[in-house]
Curated annotation (Swiss-Prot):
Annotated region described as Disordered, given as residue ranges: 27-63
UniProt keyword annotations, A-Z: Cell membrane, Lipoprotein, Membrane, Palmitate, Signal
Source superkingdom: Bacteria
Name of the protein in question: Putative lipoprotein SCO4650
Amino acid sequence: MTGTTARRTVVSVAVSAALACVTACTGPGGSDDAGHSTGPTGSARPSASAPASSRAPALTGPSADALRKVERATGRAGSARVESTTVMGRELSLEAAGALGWDDGLTGTLTITYTGGTTAETMRRLGTTAMEARYLPDAYYARMGDEFAERVGGRHWIKYVYEDLEDLGGGAGAGFADQMRNTTPNQAVKLLLSAQDVRRVGEETTRGRRTTHWSGTMGGATAQSVDIWVDDRDLLVKKVERGRTETGELTQTAYYSDYGVRVLAERPPAADTADFKELLASQGS
């Protein structure tokens, strides 16, 4: 492999890896026609937006009433601080922390630290062990390390415009775009409202706060379980989602606090930013 070919390969892998990392830390994503979520590597993930025909009938009764109160309260809060850990089989494990808002599309900033997996090893080879992700209503930005920047004309940021992601082949990009634009704490509640066997587990103490624990399972080819812990204001304190991927078990645990916190997310300097479509196109030139 020539030096130029190697450079092109590394850049292409890095662009896909950054997409996988940012998508993973926001939770299970959009689906293809079979109700599976697909990533840059083609691995199926439990879907938060499976076709309506594959879902169980909407939950009714006292449990549904309680969960809809949580959905409304969390949605109205508009923003929160987030801490999460995600493991996607042998492919990727990471930690994320920051603040996200959802009043007008997903906005905010997360610091993502790679803790293991083949994707993390790819990023480490590029001199990147952590990444800053900035979410804006029309796009998100991933900050790479200096070694990556040296390969792409000194630019550190990769820009992913959601409309451009939707144009990617195979439906995977549309799933990513939908996931990142619609990821909010109350999405986990919406999943429970369509679950087959929702149950109120009981009262528990979560990070020093009294909470009510709810649990449910979504069926289909890739079974997915969701657990949430809700405080006395009907706000999520903790969420755990579990499922399977082609590379192994998927588990995400997220904690939410400081609802209503002010969220800032600025666009990186244009001179320090490369569009992902341009990067991928240049690799084939």
